[in-house]
């Protein structure tokens, strides 16, 4: 898609904000979150994603930081939910796929992978994907058993727009 065509829609003051929000949900956010289900996300990553999202939404609405509009009001005006919630949804959706696979599937073997003789360097331990998933599941009060029923799992992890 050509960016010039897209920016014409996003910058046009005649285009309603809800339509701009739909364009954001369909085109911009998927590009922003590509592969996010596999990232062991740190708080700094999440913060950067939120900042990038809000800059785009403010720009679409014709606002600047000087206008001092609250993030919630901008999101409500455009009709989108936080990128943080969508990242969590993507991670948990992938986790559900992984858990429903057979134990002999390659993705399950990688999940159980243990490296013998591997030493970590000094400093704070790296954050693992599994730790991020556990934190997400605690926040939404989910258990691993829930992944087996796909329909229930999808409704529980869904972040509404």
Model-derived regions, located:
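Short linear motifs embedded in intrinsically disordered, charge-biased segments
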Residues: 1-161
């Amino acid at each position: 898609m050509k960016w010039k065509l897209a920016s014409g829609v996003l910058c046009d003051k005649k285009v309603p904000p809800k339509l701009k929000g739909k364009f954001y949900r369909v085109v911009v956010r998927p590009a922003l979150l590509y592969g996010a289900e596999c990232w062991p996300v740190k708080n700094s990553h999440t913060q950067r994603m939120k900042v990038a999202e809000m800059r785009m939404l403010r720009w679409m609405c014709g606002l600047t930081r000087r206008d001092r509009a609250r993030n919630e009001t901008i999101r409500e005006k455009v009709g989108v939910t936080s990128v943080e919630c969508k990242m969590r949804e993507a991670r948990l959706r992938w986790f559900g796929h992984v858990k429903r696979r057979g134990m002999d599937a390659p993705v399950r073997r990688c999940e159980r992978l243990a490296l013998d003789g591997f030493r970590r360097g000094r400093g704070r331990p790296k954050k693992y994907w599994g730790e991020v998933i556990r934190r997400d599941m605690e926040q939404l009060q989910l258990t691993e058993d829930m992944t087996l029923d796909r329909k229930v799992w999808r409704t529980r992890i869904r972040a509404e727009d």
